[in-house]
Amino acid sequence: MDSAVPLFQMEGISKRYGGVRALEKAELVVTSGSIHAILGENGAGKSTLIKVMAGVVAPDEGRMTLDGREVTFLSPAAANQAGIVCIFQELSLVPDLSVADNIVISDPPKRFGMIDRKAQRRVAEEALARAGAADIHPLALVKDLPLSRRQMVEIAKALARKPRILILDEATSALTAADVSKIFGVLKRLRSEGLALLYISHRMNEIAELADQCTVFRNGRNVASYKAGSKSDNEVVELMIGREYSHIFPAKPAAVPATAAPRLEARKLSWTDRLHDISLTVRAGEVVGLGGLDGQGQRELLLAFFGVLRGLSGEVLIDGKPVAIGSPAKARQDGIGMALIPEDRKTEGLMLPMTVRENLSFAALDRLSKGGIIDRAAEQRLIDDMVGLLAIKTAGLDIPVGALSGGNQQKVVIAKWLMRQPRIILLNDPTRGIDVGTKQELYQLMRKLADAGAAILFYSTDYDELIGCCDRVLVLYDGALKRELVGSEITERALIASALNIHGEESPVGLGASA
């Protein structure tokens, strides 16, 4: 092959879904031995672009070439055979199968017509090692692994297919910092081996560290291509959103007085070996963050408040009164008024085959029904209000919610719960895998809800979010609450030191303490 010929090229690629333009005359050039970042808001066309590349959907027009020869991929298997492998944002693993089973699922090694288990394990071990995840046992069941480790298995599964072009769609969004570092090393090594990598991420620091070339998409078109590092973050964001970029976080109000009545409290809350004597307070009008390294009990704490966990000890109080929240149904009742925005919108927050309308109404059906009959007029008014409030972009309310972009799906999850007018809102890493424009909208919404009197408890793996959004941050370490940071104390340095439990004397934390 002539070295001047790109490894892969897309020219004039267009794709529409009904009346929605997903791609319009899109162009892309991919070269061997490089990492090419694809940037853009959710709904900009990135996902459709890689689905066309990966043989998941067929373009309406345009052409693709591989090694200078025109190609058409009628299925993912055809793209895989040509050496194009995609790791999509939402995991494709089978939870009840082993790691090894998942890694070789598309082409298991066989002997005498039967799966060769010894060869399967060898292939899995080699793929895991290549992915920097040799510590994952190939015989472990995927369902027993935390989300971050499942993502590593997904990457190993892709590498087992020996790709020439590896596409990663938000592949680090569920990873711990240690795993991200490992993956960066793997990707750089793959680049040095001559692989072409397409990297889709909303994390600008990752793009700066990894990418050689960047292409920005907006409204289905590629609006700019440039050498990585040649533009500032603000310039890139302005290209993505098509307008001047202003400060992403809303202004914080004056601190809620420490004497204000608490809305949500925990007293010596414990659960198995994951939570240890947690005591905290969230007042109406506050945005309180949960910090610390990933996996230190933050998610379990949110699930405990929402009535998901069994065998808790300690007390939960609402408006100063002890309550027994034994189920999510009890948590969302009017006297409590709690909502939980889950970490994984696809599996925990939405019913993908059902319509946007059905998903929006689901959490509020008891409020919209009388005698078992839904008040359709009231339902429509509420839905219209939510679609307007969150600026949900959809071709219609009666299309499957799975057809929406990731950012708009997340807006539907949030809108679904806002239809109940919750008094307490728990958010579990709600901006994972969504674009900077949608993030900005969610930050503004969070503050607006707090200003209207909601009490918000917000877990994020992004330190910038904790600094920019929160009035207070409670840092967890090994299931225990180690430090409370307030106002100007909430800095990256303090968050990191507290997360590592190296800050020296612990600040007092507990029933409304202000460290």
Swiss-Prot record:
EC number(s) per entry: 7.5.2.7
One Gene Ontology cellular component: plasma membrane
Pfam families xrefs: ABC_tran
Domain (ABC transporter): residue spans on this chain: 8-244, 256-503
Protein's UniProt keywords contain Cell membrane: yes
Positions that bind ATP: 40-47
Membrane topology note: Peripheral membrane protein
Record key words, sorted: ATP-binding, Cell inner membrane, Cell membrane, Membrane, Nucleotide-binding, Repeat, Sugar transport, Translocase, Transport
Subcellular locations according to the entry: Cell inner membrane
Signal peptide start-end: none
Main location: membrane
Entries under CDD domains matching the protein: ABC_Carb_Monos_I, ABC_Carb_Monos_II
Listed PANTHER family: CARBOHYDRATE TRANSPORT ATP-BINDING PROTEIN MG119-RELATED, GALACTOFURANOSE TRANSPORTER ATP-BINDING PROTEIN YTFR
Name of the protein in question: Ribose import ATP-binding protein RbsA 1
Native species: Mesorhizobium japonicum (strain LMG 29417 / CECT 9101 / MAFF 303099) (Mesorhizobium loti (strain MAFF 303099))
Designated gene of the protein: rbsA1
